[in-house]
């Protein structure tokens, strides 16, 4: 009996000795916002194979919903960590984020559009300065900071301008070399309109003013008068815009709506899909949109790479011959610091996987056939060290123009004071399109200038 007891005690001592050499499992996790770099390294699964935590990503970009759903399924299959992706409809992200953040199961991963968006959500943002994701950035310039904290990380760099069907343009007797300024664009567009019956196509796609499409004009086109005013003043934000270049804004808007596939009075009923269909079915030569739209315009049953290119959004200001595309980001990933520690770590792990895993990187940067399912990838240019070159030719065009000495137009619409400001400008543009009087344009100017000061005060006190 004594021998058995002695053997049992020796065995127990050996087990305890081995246990002392391994992980204790009793270390406390740092509180949200105070992690060290080591604390945010990808954690993987817990011993025993049970996944820790879950991810809820509220996605901003409806055009990439399918790809994110597929990536979420792949990640869950590989790790066991549940990943839910919910995508807001175009123009509804802020409203949906506000609603979802009030719920018990709030998003663990969300995004803001830049400094103005961060101002609304900074109290929810986990400090990413010690995260593995932050360590993967190619430049600190892609980090969105709140004081010393890294509140958001840009996950895609994009460009927009005017997408051109070069085949149709050639049928009209022109090439992109003939368009080096706003006046050149106006001459070509108005000539196409004059010969529309003969040619069988229009100059521009419909400039839809429903919520799926109006952001192209109340935000992206509106960036141009803001950019040039900021350039004049040497500033990068303001509490009161003057509207110095709103005459040029009107000239471009007039060109779009009076040389398009539909009557200007119909624009409030026209959607993003209407404009896309105008373009891919050969009904229009010009389509204001961005690099994110590549997979929607090129591919099987659509146009070919040889059919399309992108030119700058000429505005009739400055050295237009040396103007580049409008390039920047309004897509910053943030992590909800009010989520549980397990869910925060699960979210950090998922984000890191997205920018380092071969399958995820191919999905984010690849084009036709890049998804494991065989579908088109997101064709993004992403600012992370492991990223391959994007297969998106619009991204390559931006790089080529910059290398040739052309100046990209920066994204200053991230300083627009509120979503309400954008909506008021959009509504005024739609009213003007239906009845193009000076009085109605004055209402656009008022929405742009007067409401900027009002909305800025409401947002900043």
Each predicted region: which residue ranges?
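A structural signal for short loop-to-beta-strand junctions that line the ligand-binding cleft
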Residues: 21, 100, 107-108, 129-169, ...
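Hinge/lid segment of periplasmic solute-binding proteins
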Residues: 41-49, 112-167, 216, 220-222, ...
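Extracytoplasmic "Venus flytrap"/periplasmic binding protein-like
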Residues: 74-139, 151, 167-173, 180, ...
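Extracytoplasmic/periplasmic substrate-recognition and gating elements
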Residues: 78, 172, 261, 300-370
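Short, solvent-exposed loop/beta-turn-alpha elements that line the ligand-binding surface or hinge
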Residues: 127-141, 204, 208, 226-251, ...
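Extracytoplasmic/periplasmic solute-binding protein
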Residues: 147-155, 160, 186-238, 284
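Conserved C-terminal helix/tail region of periplasmic/extracytoplasmic solute-binding proteins
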Residues: 170, 194, 401-461
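Glycine-centered hinge/linker elements that transmit conformational signals in sensory
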Residues: 189-190, 235-269
């Amino acid at each position: 009996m004594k021998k058995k007891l002695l053997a049992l005690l020796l065995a127990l001592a050996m087990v305890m000795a081995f246990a002392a050499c391994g992980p204790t499992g009793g270390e406390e996790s740092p509180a949200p916002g105070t992690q060290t770099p080591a604390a945010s390294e990808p954690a993987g699964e817990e011993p025993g194979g049970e996944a820790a935590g879950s991810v809820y990503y509220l996605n901003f970009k409806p055009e990439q919903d399918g790809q994110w759903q597929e990536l979420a399924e792949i990640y869950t299959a590989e790790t066991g960590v549940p990943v839910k992706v919910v995508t807001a409809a175009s123009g509804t992200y802020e409203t949906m984020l506000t609603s979802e953040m009030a719920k018990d199961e709030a998003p663990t991963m969300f995004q803001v559009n830049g400094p103005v968006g961060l101002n609304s959500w900074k109290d929810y943002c986990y400090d990413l300065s010690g995260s593995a994701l932050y360590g993967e950035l190619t430049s600190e310039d892609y980090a969105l900071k709140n004081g010393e904290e890294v509140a958001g990380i840009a996950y895609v760099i994009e460009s927009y301008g005017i997408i051109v069907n070069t085949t149709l343009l050639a049928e009209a007797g022109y090439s992109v070399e003939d368009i080096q300024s706003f006046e050149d664009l106006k001459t070509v567009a108005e000539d196409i309109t004059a010969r529309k019956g003969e040619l069988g196509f229009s100059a521009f796609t419909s400039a839809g003013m429903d919520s799926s499409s109006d952001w192209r004009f109340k935000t992206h086109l509106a960036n141009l008068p803001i950019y040039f005013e900021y350039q004049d003043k040497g500033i990068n934000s303001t509490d009161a815009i003057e509207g110095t270049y709103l005459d040029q804004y009107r000239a471009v808007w007039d060109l779009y709506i009076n040389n398009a596939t539909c009557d200007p009075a119909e624009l409030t009923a026209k959607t993003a899909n209407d404009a896309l269909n105008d373009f891919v079915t050969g009904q229009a030569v010009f389509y204001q949109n961005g690099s994110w739209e590549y997979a929607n315009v090129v591919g099987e049953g659509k146009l070919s790479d040889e059919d399309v290119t992108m030119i700058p959004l000429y505005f009739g200001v400055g050295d237009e011959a040396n103007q580049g595309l409008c390039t920047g980001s309004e897509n910053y990933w943030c992590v909800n610091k009010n989520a549980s520690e397990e869910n925060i770590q699960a979210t950090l792990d998922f984000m890191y996987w997205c920018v380092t895993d071969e399958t995820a990187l191919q999905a984010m940067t690849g084009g036709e056939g890049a998804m494991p399912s065989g579908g088109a990838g997101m064709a993004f240019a992403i600012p992370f060290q492991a990223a391959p070159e994007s297969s998106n030719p619009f991204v390559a065009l931006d790089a080529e123009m910059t290398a040739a000495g052309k100046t990209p137009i920066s994204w200053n619409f991230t300083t627009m004071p509120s979503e309400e400001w954008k909506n008021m400008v959009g509504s005024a543009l739609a009213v003007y399109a239906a009845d193009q009087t000076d009085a109605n344009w004055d209402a656009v100017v008022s929405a742009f200038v007067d409401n900027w000061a009002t909305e800025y005060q409401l947002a900043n006190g």
